[in-house]
From Swiss-Prot:
Keywords: Early protein. Induction: Expressed in the early phase of the viral replicative cycle. The keyword Magnesium does not apply. Plays a role in virus cell tropism, and may be required for efficient virus replication in macrophages. Belongs to the asfivirus MGF 505 family. This is Protein MGF 505-5R.
Length: 498
């Protein structure tokens, strides 16, 4: 529990002028050799009614003087204990240091507040479990290169590697330069990995400077392949400024490099280099095919097509193959708007294995008439699509039957026509037709040599006790005229029973 005096000391913000120095001392609001102490707001103190300083600066001063009583007062006023420890370290007051250090968890939290390398080391020594590598790593993070210089001979090659990576990740550029110039580093290429990871052009530039000006070990054996790798990485990440920085030191933007930009749809990188390079037609075509496979945006596809002047004659089949394999229609739509129609060739492939929902969207996107969709479905033996598309056109079964009959007349594909007739007959079975309509359907079957369906509807008519002799005669004339031998035999057989 706080005493009444402590509560007063913590919360008093105003000292009356009439209080004597003796009373102020008894209240514990007096700093030896400085005078009275008064709290000003949350962050400042007033000394001897004259000097205002930050509370943490006052804590550092009190710690340096070893004034435990003033330190406790300022901590009561919510000062930062780290500054008291720094001051105590500066004044070598170890009893106060031990007392204060027991109240904190980690000396490493204090290190960023210290600017003096000697105090930095003394503070780090408070943690008995830490080693030299730990000291150097924190020195690097807190811009204390002199500590690294002092202890570099105490570090193993593995330790040096860790310190170098830490300097790179912490973006301590001066330390990175100094290490690259003065210390043997096992894997210096890590600077480039970190530069790409952090997207840090400065670090990339430092790496190249060390590589070319100081020839840091093991990095000058495969410079060309290293630069090419960096260009590919940068292109794949869309980092044009990285590519331009790399090109200052060598390398070339090859098709392999541009392919990385295409794969990840970085149009700005492509645009920049396509404007400046005269690529062969074949190279542009390969980039376009890659863009289709990568499902790139319309803008990227249009960019590549523009450099081809929208001429795709050489790769038409390859485009269709990519569209089919990767199920992308963006390129088809772009070319369609340019009056280059690839819809027909791809429609058969798509309708062969895609769902009705997908094909409806495809039909709407490219304004394809349902008649074409149904005929193509018939060619590809997709009765399910025939039924669904025809339902979409005609809601009533009889209307649908007449609609499908009209398509048979213009259907040239033999197997497709047979499937349409088969679908029509199934539809006929599912709906009730008048005898006149059944006669018309029988004549339709005769005209198209649909023997099985003709025989079936004739049997249905006979079951209804309807005289079909005249119908058979009429259909026989049709069969003879069109030279349908099997249908002729079927009709003659039926006539023998009439």
């Amino acid at each position: 529990m706080f005493s009444l005096q402590e509560i007063c000391r913590k919360n008093i913000y105003f000292l009356p002028d009439w209080l004597s120095e003796h009373v102020i001392q008894r209240l514990g609001l007096y700093w030896e050799k400085h005078g009275s102490l008064q709290r000003i707001g949350d962050d400042y103190v007033l000394i001897q009614q004259d000097l205002i300083i930050p509370i943490n600066e006052a804590l550092r001063m009190a710690g340096e003087e070893g004034s435990d009583e003033v330190v406790q007062l300022l901590l009561l006023w919510e000062g930062n204990i780290h500054y008291a420890i720094i001051g105590a370290l500066e004044g070598d007051h170890y009893s106060l240091i031990r007392k204060l250090y027991d109240q904190i968890e980690d000396c490493h939290d204090i290190l960023p507040l210290i600017q003096d390398p000697k105090i930095f080391e003394k503070c780090h020594e408070l943690d008995k479990s830490c080693n030299i590598l730990c000291l150097v790593l924190h020195a690097v993070k807190n811009d204390m290169p002199c500590i690294l210089q002092d202890y570099k001979t105490h570090l193993s090659g593995e330790d040096i590697q860790v310190v170098f990576e830490t300097a790179c990740r912490s973006q301590k550029y001066d330390i990175v330069r100094w290490m690259g110039q003065n210390i043997a580093i096992y894997n210096p290429e890590v600077i480039f990995n970190i530069a790409f990871d952090k997207i840090n052009t400065t670090l990339l530039s430092i790496g190249y400077t060390l590589l070319f000006n100081h020839r840091i070990n093991n990095m000058n054996e495969n410079i060309d392949s290293l630069l090419t790798q960096h260009l590919e990485w940068a292109a794949g990440m869309g980092l044009l400024h990285f590519m331009l920085e790399t090109l200052k030191y060598g390398g070339d933007v090859t098709i392999a490099v541009l392919s990385e930009a295409v794969k990840y749809d970085h149009r700005k990188v492509l645009d920049y280099f396509l404007r400046r390079k005269n690529l062969y037609q074949e190279d542009l075509e390969e980039l376009l095919l890659l863009a289709i496979r990568a499902d790139c945006s319309k803008k990227t596809l249009n960019l590549l097509l523009s450099y081809l002047n929208y001429s795709i004659n050489n790769i038409r089949k390859k485009i269709l193959q990519c569209v089919k394999e990767y199920e992308t229609t963006i390129i088809i739509k772009i070319l369609w708007k340019r009056k280059i129609n690839l819809i027909g060739p791809i429609l058969a492939d798509f309708i062969g294995y895609h769902s009705y929902t997908y094909m409806v969207d495809f039909m709407r996107e490219f304004s394809i008439h349902p008649e074409k969709m149904i005929k193509m479905a018939a060619r590809e033996s997709r009765e399910d699509l025939i039924i669904k598309f025809s339902k979409n056109v005609c809601k009533e079964p009889k209307d649908r039957l007449h609609y499908l009959k009209s398509l048979v007349y213009t259907m040239r594909h033999k197997e497709g026509k047979q499937l349409l007739i088969y679908t029509i007959h199934n539809l006929y079975k599912a709906c009730h037709l008048e005898s006149k309509e059944m006669f018309n359907l029988a004549r339709f079957y005769a005209r198209h040599n649909a023997v099985i369906q003709f025989k079936s509807i004739c049997q249905d008519l006979s079951k209804l006790n309807i005289n079909i002799k005249n119908l058979l005669l009429e259909c026989l004339r049709i069969a003879i005229k069109k030279n349908y031998p099997q249908l002729i035999r079927t009709i003659k057989t039926d006539m023998s029973y009439e």
